[in-house]
Amino acid sequence: MKPIVKQIVKPILVIGRHGQVSQALKATQPDCYQVDYLGREALDIRSSLRVAQVLDQRDYGLVINASGYTQVDAAETDSQAPFALNHLAVKALAGHCGKRGIRLIHLSSDYVFDGRQNKPYRPEDTPNPLSRYGESKWRGELAALEYGQGHTCIVRTSWLYSPFGHNFVKTMLTLMCQGKPLKVVDDQWGTPTSALALGQFIWQLIQVIKPEPIYHWSDLGVTSWYEFARQISDSANALGLLDEPANLSPISTQEYGAAAPRPHYSALDTIGSQGILPAKRWQDNLIQVLQQLAKEG
C-alpha cells in the first residue's frame, strides 16, 4: 500500500550546497518546488543564531540537512569537529525547526551500526557505532528526533557515490586510469548507493503526509568494497573510461590498517522505503553514474 501523499507548496531549504547529496538533489529536483541550496559560506549550522536568522527569512515548509562531517578516519583523532557538526549543530537545527513547525529531513549513515549481524539492518534496530564518526552520527539522530518535536525524519544511507564531489567511484576511476596496482578491502560488506537515486527518494519522501521517524535507503544488493571496485573496473572498461581492466587485489581490513574501525556488515533493510520509491540494483545505478561521467569527459 502506497503512503498518502501531499504537494509541498512552501519553499524548501537544503543545507550543504557543495556536498554530493545536495548536488544530487539539485540534479533530480522536480520543477514544482522552490528550493534554496545554502553552503557553509551562507549558513554554517554550527551557529545557532545564524540558523534562526535564515529560517526566519522565508516561510520554509521543509529543511533537508545534507551537511555533515564525513572524514571517518580523521574523526578518530579530532575530539571536537565531528560532534560539533554531526551532533550539536543538528540538535540546534532540529530545535529551531521544531519550534517553527518546520519539517526536517536529516541524513545519516550505516556506520551507526556495529556490523555484527549477518542480515540487513532495519530502521528499528539499535545502533552501536564502532567509530567516533558513527557515534557522532548516532548522537545527531537522537538529538534530531528529540528536539524536532515530531517534525524530524531520519534517512540512513550507505556507501554513497555520484558524479559529484569526492567518493569511492571517482577515486577508484582516477587511480585505475593511472594503471597502478590497487589493493581493496574484501571483508567489509554493504550496499553502494547512488546519490542520484537517494535524491529521487527524498523528493518522493517529502510528499508523504505521515512519514516514519527513520527510513533506510540504498540501492539493491550486497557486495564488498573489493567486488565494488571490480564492477567499477568492468563497467568503466566497457564504457571506454578505461583502456584496460584495473589491476586489483583483495586485502583484509586488518592489513589495510585504517584509523577508524568499520562495520563488517552494514547492509540496510529498505523494505519500508520501497513503497515510496522502488530501488534499483546497485550495478545498474553504477552504470548510469559512469555513463554520466563518460559524457562529461
What are these regions (language model features)?
Residues K280-G297:
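Amphipathic terminal alpha-helices
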Residues K10-T28:
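N-terminal Rossmann NAD(P)H-binding glycine-rich loop of SDR-like oxidoreductase domains
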Residues I15, L38, A66-S67, L104-S109, ...:
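SDR active-site strand-loop-helix element
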Residues A84, L88-A92, K99, V112-V155, ...:
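Catalytic helix-loop patch of NAD(P)-dependent Rossmann-fold dehydrogenases
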Residues F201, V208-A258:
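Mid/C-terminal beta-alpha module of Rossmann-like enzyme folds, strongest
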Residues L142-G190, L196-W203:
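NAD(P)-dependent short-chain dehydrogenase/reductase
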Residues D36-L49:
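Rossmann-fold cofactor-recognition segment
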Residues S48-H87, G98:
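NAD(P)H-binding glycine-rich loop region in Rossmannoid oxidoreductase-like domains
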